[in-house]
């Protein structure tokens, strides 16, 4: 059976994070493994609290997965802070992960900040160069690229700028462009 690992936050409401990733994996016949980076208290009304796990706990989970079995693919989601991003990137590099998809979760749908500014910079410097694909929404693409996205041509410019980090492909996800 195919296996994939998701490295992300836990969503108590079940609509995002690890819980949503596992549902998606299962729908495609993929056995999902998890590394939890943060625990959130959230529901359909928004995010009430976020608690990042200690870096050592994240590292222990990752080592436990990779020392036992390889995964065909790895996806990252909410990573929380610079230290977690740095450690995850180091371990993914050490274990030579080839199929890495980065969902650069910076804000929740309701607007709560989920990754520190230093975490964003660490992601650009250490994690994106390891990735095959990055899937930012419009707001995340603006932050990663430094380009304001107002029209379709801006999307292409932002994607090209993100490619300069070393990631091999960029897919801007929709639903966040004003007026569309």
Segments predicted by a language model, with ranges:
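Short, glycine/charged-enriched secondary-structure capping and boundary segments
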Residues: 20-22, 48-50, 88-91, 114-117, ...
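A short acidic, helix-capping loop that chelates divalent metal ions and anchors anionic groups
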Residues: 40-48, 108-113, 141-145
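Helix C-cap/helix->beta junction micro-motif
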Residues: 28, 95-96, 130, 166
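Small-residue (G/A/S/T)-rich helix-start motifs and N-terminal tracts that mark the onset
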Residues: 1-73, 153-180
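Conserved phosphate/ATP/ADP-binding segment of small-molecule kinases
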Residues: 117-180
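Non-cysteine beta-strand/loop elements that form the S-adenosyl-L-methionine
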Residues: 33-37, 99-104, 127-139
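Glycine/small-residue-rich loop that forms an oxyanion/phosphate-binding "nest" at active or ligand-binding sites
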Residues: 66-129
């Amino acid at each position: 059976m195919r296996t994939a690992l998701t490295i992300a936050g836990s969503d108590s409401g079940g609509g995002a994070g690890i819980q949503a990733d596992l549902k998606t994996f299962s729908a495609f016949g993929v056995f999902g493994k998890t590394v939890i980076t943060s625990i959130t208290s959230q529901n359909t009304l928004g995010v009430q609290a976020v608690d990042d796990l200690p870096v050592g706990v994240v590292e222990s989970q990752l080592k436990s997965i990779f020392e036992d079995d390889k995964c065909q693919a790895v996806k990252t989601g909410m990573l929380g802070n610079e230290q977690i991003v740095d450690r995850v990137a180091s371990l993914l590099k050490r274990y030579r992960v080839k199929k890495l998809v980065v969902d650069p979760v910076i804000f929740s749908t309701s607007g709560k900040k989920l990754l520190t500014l230093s975490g964003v910079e660490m992601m650009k410097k250490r994690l994106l160069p390891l990735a095959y694909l990055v899937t930012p929404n419009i707001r995340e693409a603006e932050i990663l690229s430094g380009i304001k996205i107002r029209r379709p041509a801006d999307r292409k410019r932002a994607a090209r700028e993100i490619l300069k980090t070393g990631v091999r492909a960029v897919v801007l996800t929709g639903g966040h462009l004003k007026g569309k």
